[in-house]
């Protein structure tokens, strides 16, 4: 009778094992988000209008583009930036959630003048990065670039969309 119990236990375990199929693991493949040149942007020194730098830019002018920004990207090439264009002049707040590299945020008013900065914003931080004054545009560039270019409040930008 002891052998029957062992045999029955073996059969039950075997049936359970057969019924527990490992579900095939579905690999979710996401395409990397890459830079798409949508315009050119120049930064000009206040007073002299001398050219400080020129950038290839992506333009974020829809709700989705403004909400996503540079999230889910591992880096940004030197000479690239993202220009956020808002419908209204207002206080705008940014954060670095899901952004993988540090950025300088350059806040620009409706006259295309630099109004304030948030320098060296760190990856993945969810703290608020406010514009400090009402603005219409925000330019994101790699961290350290605003100092390298010696940008100051009152400098200006000029941009154009590429066809």
Name each region found by the language model:
Residues 16-19:
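C-terminal motif of bacterial Sec signal peptides marking the signal peptidase cleavage site
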Residues 21-163:
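Compact, glycine-rich, soluble single-domain proteins
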């Amino acid at each position: 009778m002891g052998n029957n119990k062992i045999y029955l236990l073996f059969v039950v375990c075997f049936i359970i094992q057969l019924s527990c199929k490992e579900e095939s693991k579905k690999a979710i493949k996401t395409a990397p988000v890459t830079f798409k040149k949508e315009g050119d942007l120049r930064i000009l020194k206040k007073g002299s209008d001398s050219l400080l730098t020129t950038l290839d830019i992506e333009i974020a002018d829809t709700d989705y583009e403004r909400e996503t920004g540079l999230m889910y990207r591992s880096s940004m090439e030197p000479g690239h930036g993202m220009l956020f264009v808002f419908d209204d002049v207002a206080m705008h707040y940014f954060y670095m959630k899901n952004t993988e590299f540090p950025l300088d945020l350059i806040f620009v008013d409706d006259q295309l003048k630099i109004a304030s900065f948030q320098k060296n914003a760190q990856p993945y931080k969810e703290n608020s990065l406010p514009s400090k004054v009402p603005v219409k545009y925000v330019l994101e560039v790699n961290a350290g670039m605003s100092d390298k270019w010696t940008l100051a409040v009152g400098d200006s930008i000029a941009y154009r969309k590429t066809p």
